[in-house]
Amino acid sequence: MSGAGEGDTFEKLYGIILDRLERRPEGSYTASLAERGMGHVARKVGEEAAELMVAALTGEGVAAEAADLIYHVLVLLAMTGVGLEGLKAELERRMPGAGDGGDGKGP
């Protein structure tokens, strides 16, 4: 179910997040998250995960809630310094054939 441009979407969004975190433009939701701190961002990730669980159970709004969760996770990754590249590296490490066969937490 992969398609051309999927990575581009995540990279484009992550680039926008990095820009907003650096410039902190007035009215930016991303900038307001950063100003409230890591604790707030971490709570938002938990809140969005819970909303995605409910959506999955009801079958309503799954894509929208998944998008909200991914956005907040990307903000958290940017703020912690792990970044999108760190996430990609960890996912690659977990894939079968990654040298040690992965750690059983991936595909």
Listing of model-derived features with the role each one plays in the protein:
Residues 1-66, 70-107:
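Flexible "arm" and connector segments at domain edges
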